[in-house]
Design a protein with these regions (language model features):
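Membrane-integrated ABC transporters
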Residues: 1-35, 55-63, 82, 86, ...
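Extended non-transmembrane interhelical loops and adjacent amphipathic helices
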Residues: 1-8, 91-137, 199-242, 314-327, ...
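Transmembrane helix-loop-helix hairpins at lipid-water interfaces of multipass membrane proteins
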Residues: 22-78, 156-189, 267-270, 276-283, ...
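ABC-fold ATPase nucleotide-binding domain signature/coupling loops
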Residues: 122, 462-495, 504, 517, ...
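Cytosolic ends of transmembrane helices, especially the final helix of ABC transmembrane type-1 domains
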Residues: 224, 268, 289-325
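Helix-to-loop junction immediately C-terminal to a conserved catalytic motif
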Residues: 393-394
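ABC ATPase nucleotide-binding domain helical subdomain, centered on the C-loop/LSGGQ "ABC signature"
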Residues: 403-405, 420, 438-482, 526-527, ...
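C-terminal portion of ABC ATPase nucleotide-binding domains
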Residues: 471, 527, 544, 549-593
Length: 593
């Protein structure tokens, strides 16, 4: 069976994490298997003393009781220790597998991340390591918990079968039919897993939105509370309907197993009473057999429900996780070359590109060159391909046709990490990471403090940072640090630009990096960046044209092609589309007297 193969592989990973895992499971199996059988002897022994009391009956009963209590204490203590150790190893295994998953995602081609197709393909894989309830931990924990119960059921079933073979056969049939009922109920969940995952994502979204500080203002000012709560209730109702269907299916499918169990218990009771009457079973054995029957039913229900849900049902998530870890389809990085040294020229040669799952060509047979140390501006309306050129240049996406060259070398020939070293990129969306200010400037674990300070000064943040105590060593996330360093949106934008200043790369790319700054502040930033572009090939993108006057050349894109090209002065004299764009925006760059 498929889940047996998956469980075997997961156990192998757990044992590689900690070889003592074998001992923990072995002890749990031995103790769990024999404990119920041994403890069922207690009433038999006590009744035996009562029937033949002698002069020291009370002492013997106390000794028997004490012995069994001590035995139970030891068994429970060792079992609890083994269970805790299994749980510890299971979580260690989960974290190691989670680390492998993250490595896989980090090296996946950007196209899988950008449209979340990787999460559609492998959504269940992330559920396998997302918590310590199900998935990896659930399978290992419940296997260690149900394996000894199954062994115990075999032993108890053997004792019962020795007395009544028909009862033993019916109990086996009961276990099979009840397991089938549970399997069908779980199948209801598995068959609708995609829809359930979608609903779970919606529930998580509403939970996050309700407590999100950034959403709090609009929720209150626009009175969105009722709308959000109604939507949340609808999602919860959908989730409840799936659970209700599973419960109803379990009930219907379980009726046959319940009927078989009643018949088995009736036959066993009849056989036991007859054996008691003819003297082949004494009073103590009578109580022991009753105890064993009760234990069998309770243990069987628990083992089947837990095993079916936590082991079999969770297998699909763990299988998906292993599929993700094994696939080689997510990365097309097969480059072998190291980064280029010195100045770099760029060439787009007959490049055509459409984003995944679309037919619209964003770039259509586009060709242009950027000389070493030249600075160009890419301008045009939204959707004309400016940011797409950057995405292709840094190999986040790959052209459908044509090639992109650095110093005459196709970018596909470079190792991914070596290619990235050649670019200092600042994008419109600023991400602040839960590390220190120094780490967020350098984007490295260790950094040059003086170099970081110069970068901050170059983007005009020196005075703001000097207001803070130990600013460069302060974490920038309130989620991990109480005294986190907090910057405004515009200041975060400047911090992002300081990363490009800090990084020693031959190609500088600024894709709408001043979107959160006003026009005059943007002009000042670009004026400073103009002083820093020496010995760098630079590409500027901005809807606002504050940067274009500093560029050696301007490329205006329209319809996936170059519509206008030239210096600022040349295009202004041409009085074409660039002239109109710049003239309309010009008033925003003029300071008031």
């Amino acid at each position: 069976m498929k889940y047996t193969k998956t469980l075997k592989r997961l156990l192998g990973d757990a044992i590689r994490t900690d070889r003592k895992m074998i001992l923990y499971i072995l002890f749990a199996c031995l103790l769990g298997a024999f404990a119920p059988l041994v403890l069922s002897l207690m009433p038999k022994l006590i009744v035996g003393v009562v029937e033949n009391p002698g002069t020291d009956a009370i002492r013997r009963i106390l000794l028997i009781s004490l012995g069994f209590f001590v035995l139970e204490f030891l068994v429970e203590g060792v079992s609890l220790y083994c269970s805790n150790q299994v749980l510890t190893v299971a979580n260690k295994t989960r974290f190691e597998l989670m680390h492998e998953q993250n490595k896989k995602i980090a090296t996946a081609d950007f196209k899988y991340i950008s449209d979340r197709s990787i999460f559609k393909m492998y959504g269940m894989a992330f559920e396998a390591t997302s918590g310590d309830w199900g998935g990896v931990v659930g399978m290992l924990r419940e296997f260690a918990r149900t394996a000894p119960i199954i062994l115990s059921l075999i032993l108890i079933g053997g004792v019962i079968t020795a007395l009544s073979p028909l009862t033993g056969l019916l109990l086996l049939l009961y276990a099979i039919t009840y397991a089938y009922a549970q399997r069908q109920a779980n199948k209801e969940v598995i068959d609708n897993d995609a829809e359930i995952n979608k609903i779970s994502d919606e529930i998580r979204y509403y939970n996050k939105t309700a407590g999100d500080f950034k959403s709090g203002k609009e929720i209150r000012l626009f009175n969105l509370k009722d709308m959000i709560l109604n939507a949340y209730k609808n999602v919860i109702d959908k989730r409840k309907s799936f659970s209700l269907r599973a419960v109803n299916k379990t009930f219907r499918k379980s009726l046959l197993s319940v009927l078989i169990l009643i018949i088995a218990q009736g036959i066993f009771a009849y056989t036991l009473i007859l054996s008691f009457k003819n003297g082949s079973v004494d009073t103590g054995s009578f109580l022991m057999y009753l105890t064993l029957m009760l234990q069998f039913v309770l243990l069987a229900d628990r083992a089947i429900e837990d095993y079916e849900f936590f082991v079999v049902n969770q297998t699909i998530y763990v299988e998906n996780m292993y599929d993700l870890l094994e696939t080689d389809k997510l990365s097309s990085d097969h480059g072998t070359r190291d980064r280029l040294s010195g100045a770099v020229d760029i060439e787009f040669r007959n490049v055509t590109f459409a984003y995944p799952n679309t037919d619209k060509k964003v770039l259509d047979n586009l060709s242009f060159k950027i000389a070493k140390n030249e600075t160009i501006a890419l301008v045009g309306n939204n959707g004309e391909g400016k940011s797409t050129i950057i995405n292709l240049l840094v190999r986040l996406f790959r052209p459908d046709e044509g090639e992109i060259l650095l110093n005459g070398v196709n970018i596909n020939e470079f190792k991914e990490e070596e290619l990235y070293k050649m670019f200092a990129c600042i994008f419109q969306q600023v991400n602040i990471y839960p590390y220190t200010l120094g780490n967020n400037i350098s984007m490295q674990e260790t950094y040059d403090l003086e170099r970081a300070k110069r970068a901050i000064e170059d983007v005009g943040l020196k005075e703001r940072i000097e207001e803070e105590k130990n600013a460069y060593e302060r974490n920038m996330s309130h989620e991990v640090a109480k005294d986190a360093l907090e910057l405004s949106g515009g200041q975060e934008q400047k911090l992002a630009i300081s990363r490009a200043v800090y990084k020693d790369s031959p190609i500088l790319i600024l894709d709408e990096p001043t979107a959160n700054l006003d026009a005059l502040a943007e002009h000042e930033i670009y004026s400073k960046l103009n002083d820093l572009r020496e010995d760098r090939t630079s590409i500027y993108i901005s809807h606002r044209l504050s940067s274009t006057k500093f560029c050696d050349r301007i490329i205006l894109l329209k319809g996936g092609k170059i519509f206008e090209e030239g210096t600022h002065d040349e295009l202004m004299k041409k009085k074409g589309e660039y002239y109109e764009m710049f003239t309309i925006q010009g008033k925003y760059y003029t300071k008031e007297a």
